[in-house]
């Protein structure tokens, strides 16, 4: 029996953490509980918020306003560079780890807070109330083996968008059992999502809006380039019902030995390319829709990619226990990759359900991101 798309999104809507989390993670992060059923805390100041998230105790934290970190840690003026020129909409770059190389030197001033994310600890739930939960000028950092964390219905924005290396929204550097749901990321200096050089396992990123509309970019226009840099050894990511919009690259850069299951996600308005990466990255894309994407992936990608179609959908049974849903396209480049050698790597992982690509296109852009949790209440 074919399950309606909305029902797929809401299969576990009755399960909640302390009555503030809606739904439950599907895919690789199934079973995550975050802070559990303890009494929620409602921080009023930046200091209270950071203290709660960086504490060693389980916490359920509810955001009811914008927490503005811009200017709270001062600014830095130093030599940076102009890899793409100094035009009004061109990103400049911070010389992190000598990245600038021989590019033209320019003097830059950037905000320090955005470069140093909040180091969230294990057993945490962070949820925004309505559309009010915003982190401005500060991202979230998951490292050192932290686990069992839920982040739902928040927005992260204003991370030095004029400067490469200015700030990442979500950084994962050795984390496990993480669910990022109904979040919006925008105006980042660098990546919306980045995984580092330690394994990041059992992660589900779902119903998120990766908003690439920006003030400065590597293309000197309003399309953000640095979207998702996935380079961890053994990363496991379910990418479900997300909307990647108005970007030009690294959507994702699928490298390391990342295992990436993209299901019912939508890529739209991308004049550059979407998928790139190194030779050991592994990605299965099913039930996804590509709308106005000039290049979805290289014709001969370095990484291992499988794009589901009506012709090859049945071959997914060995990996997913079911046939795949075919991807859909409108005014986009070809995506004919059909590598199946990595399918055995799905063994033991929880697989997200999938609906059709056309249903994803109709539903996901209108219902992803902050302030749209009520979709499952009907």
Swiss-Prot record:
GO terms for cellular component: extracellular region. SMART domains: Amb_all (SM00656). Its EC number is 4.2.2.10. GO terms for biological process: cell wall organization; pectin catabolic process. It is an enzyme of class 4 (lyase). Pfam families: Pectate_lyase_4. Its main location: secreted. The keyword ATP-binding does not apply. It catalyses: Eliminative cleavage of (1->4)-alpha-D-galacturonan methyl ester to give oligosaccharides with 4-deoxy-6-O-methyl-alpha-D-galact-4-enuronosyl groups at their non-reducing ends. Belongs to the polysaccharide lyase 1 family. This is Probable pectin lyase C. It comes from Aspergillus niger.
